[in-house]
Every structure is written in structure tokens, then in C-alpha cells.
């Protein structure tokens, strides 16, 4: 059964501006520790952040809370399997919170074009 759906669209230029204005501090506020190494190697840091932000915002919408404790951006890591399929890894606190609300599986799709990144998230129970 579907227990939550969320989608988000992020403009890459917005993240270019954020990086120009605030530097690496933006990444440290948005990314989980596991994502920071991948960000450091990213060929296009603004696009990397835009994709992660869209996925995390869509996650927060599927959770039905928006971004507020325990659904915080650094508590959500966007990972991928060996074929590149995106997935989520959550902090222990967030994982327990989701489990208590009946979320058993999470699905995420991320797409990007030159100017925008889009993410769609489904929570199953």
C-alpha cells in the first residue's frame, strides 16, 4: 500500500549561486556524511546538490512533514546500487520514525536536464 508520495523540481542555477555565495558550507548543511565524499568528486557540484536536494525534498513531502525533525536533509542520504539505481539511507532516528509510521519500502526516481533536476518518491507500507 502506498503511504506517501512526493515530488520536487530543483533549478541547477540556484545551486550554482548558493555555491558561489556560501561555498562548501552549503554541502555540509544539505548532505549526509556519506554523501560528502561523492560531492567532493562530483564533476558538476551544483548539479549534484540540485539532484540531492530534489530527492530529499520529495522524501520530506512523501513523509508528509516537510523538512523538520526528524526529517532533516543531513539525515537522508541518497545512495545508489551497483547499476546506478538511486535509493535512500536514513539516520537511525529517521529510520525508526519511518518504521513507526508503517513505511516498509522507499522508491526514488531522479532525472535531470541542463537546467533542472526532478525527483519522485514513493513510500510503501
UniProtKB/Swiss-Prot annotation:
It is found in: Cytoplasm. Its cofactor is Mg(2+). One of its GO terms (molecular function) is holo-[acyl-carrier-protein] synthase activity. Belongs to the P-Pant transferase superfamily. AcpS family. Keywords: Cytoplasm, Fatty acid biosynthesis, Fatty acid metabolism, Lipid biosynthesis, Lipid metabolism, Magnesium, Metal-binding, Transferase. This is Holo-[acyl-carrier-protein] synthase. Pfam families: ACPS. Its EC number is 2.7.8.7. It is an enzyme of class 2 (transferase). The gene is acpS. It comes from Laribacter hongkongensis (strain HLHK9).
Amino acid at each position: 500500500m502506498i503511504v506517501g508520495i512526493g515530488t520536487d523540481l530543483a533549478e541547477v542555477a540556484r545551486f550554482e549561486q548558493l555555491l558561489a555565495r556560501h561555498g562548501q558550507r552549503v554541502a555540509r548543511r544539505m548532505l549526509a556524511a556519506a554523501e560528502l565524499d561523492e560531492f567532493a568528486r562530483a564533476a558538476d557540484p551544483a548539479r549534484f546538490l540540485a539532484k540531492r536536494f530534489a530527492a530529499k525534498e520529495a522524501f520530506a513531502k512523501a513523509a508528509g512533514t516537510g523538512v523538520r525533525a526528524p526529517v532533516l536533509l543531513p539525515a537522508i542520504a541518497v545512495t545508489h546500487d551497483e547499476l546506478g539505481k538511486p535509493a535512500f539511507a536514513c539516520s537511525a532516528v529517521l529510520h525508526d520514525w519511518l518504521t513507526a509510521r508503517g513505511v516498509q519500502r522507499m522508491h526514488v526516481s531522479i532525472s535531470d536536464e541542463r537546467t533542472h533536476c526532478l525527483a519522485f518518491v514513493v513510500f510503501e507500507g
